[in-house]
Amino acid sequence: MSFYTLQAEAPTIVALYRAPAFIEFLAALTGQRLQPCPDNDPHSCALYFYTEPGDHIGFHFDTSYYRGARYTVLLGLIERSSSRLVCQLFKDDPQRQPRELQLATHPGTLIAFNGDKLWHAVTPLGVDEERVSLTLEYVTDPSMHPAKRLFSNLKDAFAYFGIKAVFRRSRSSKAAANPGG
């Protein structure tokens, strides 16, 4: 469920995402000056539902097209599953011994990381299991090259939220910003 849906249907979640005290806490945790992603980023604040057997996300980096770093914050909401967040620390670092963590995201569990640097996955959901996580994204620099914004929008449209959700929102955001033209 994208940021756009949460804005309309769950404003309290968006208020938490934007709360100055919460952002200050995360900045202290990461050692970075953080800010929310721009309003045209559907991943900035999103709910991810795992409800069908086999639901998972394979190993990946949270590739960011922002000019600065992007930090991912996961907040466990529902954890009735054997599914785990698997993190492989020090992947491709010849100076350090690789280490794997498998983390349950029980309700209230908060996990923060730089998604561009952490190789991670969510293991497959079992039968009659359910997992729901709130994902919050924060950046050190919210600017993005226009070509990378287009690529990011296409990825979001086809891999995550659907064409209508991504591009309808982009058009309505532009119209609101430029009502006369």
Residue ranges and their predicted role:
Residues 1-16:
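A glycine-rich, hydrophobic loop/mini-helix early in the fold
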